A protein has these predicted regions:
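Active-site loop-to-helix "anion-binding N-cap" substructures in soluble metabolic enzymes
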Residues: 1-184
């Protein structure tokens, strides 16, 4: 995407009253969106006063090859390039395991936590421990009313990026209720 197109779309979003924007979703990446495109959009969103929700994730092949952490760390580093330290806390990062999107499969709570912990570690390395603790990390791989509580109980999962489950009000309400349960 050309830089001026990004700026025009961001201005239109702000004019429409948007506050958040999902960037780097697996569907966009499948259509050819690159890490450089994601970075340009993150920077444009921040400049416009929007809160970017930057997605990152791995394919099943990458997971099975044992390169998940390296892949995610690279996406974080490239996606956040040039984001000043005083704006990093405004960025929300969503872990979106591509192999789980729309397949009915989901990462186990332990798998999701492992990746979200590596996301926080990447932010710590790029910025600081204080900023790493302050950012929000979402899980977005087929979270539903049945698995939300266990996923949201993980220490490095701060919320969910809900897809299909948000279209069924009864299921979405159960996810919201799970998010409001105290973690012990």
């Amino acid at each position: 995407m050309k830089p001026h197109h990004t700026v025009l779309k961001v201005v239109s979003m702000v004019d429409a009253g948007c506050k958040y924007v999902i960037i780097g979703h697996s569907e966009r990446r499948a259509m050819g969106e690159t890490d450089a495109d994601v970075n340009a959009k993150v920077l444009a969103a921040l400049d416009a006063g929007l809160t970017p929700i930057m997605c990152c994730g791995e394919t099943l092949e990458q997971r099975e090859s044992g390169i998940t952490t390296e892949w995610i760390t690279m996406q974080i580093k490239l996606g956040l390039a040039g984001v000043p330290e005083d704006k990093i806390r405004k960025v929300i990062i969503a872990y979106e395991p591509i192999w789980a999107i729309g397949t009915g499969r989901t990462a186990s709570p332990e798998q999701a936590e492992e990746v979200c912990e590596s996301i926080r570690a990447a932010v710590r390395k790029l910025y600081s421990s204080k900023n790493a603790r302050a950012i929000s990390i979402l899980y977005g791989g087929s979270m539903n009313d049945k698995n939300a509580f266990e996923l949201l109980a993980q220490p490095d999962i701060d919320g969910g990026l809900i897809g299909g489950a948000s279209l069924v009000p009864e299921k979405f309400v159960k996810i919201i209720e799970a998010a409001n349960q105290p973690n012990e």
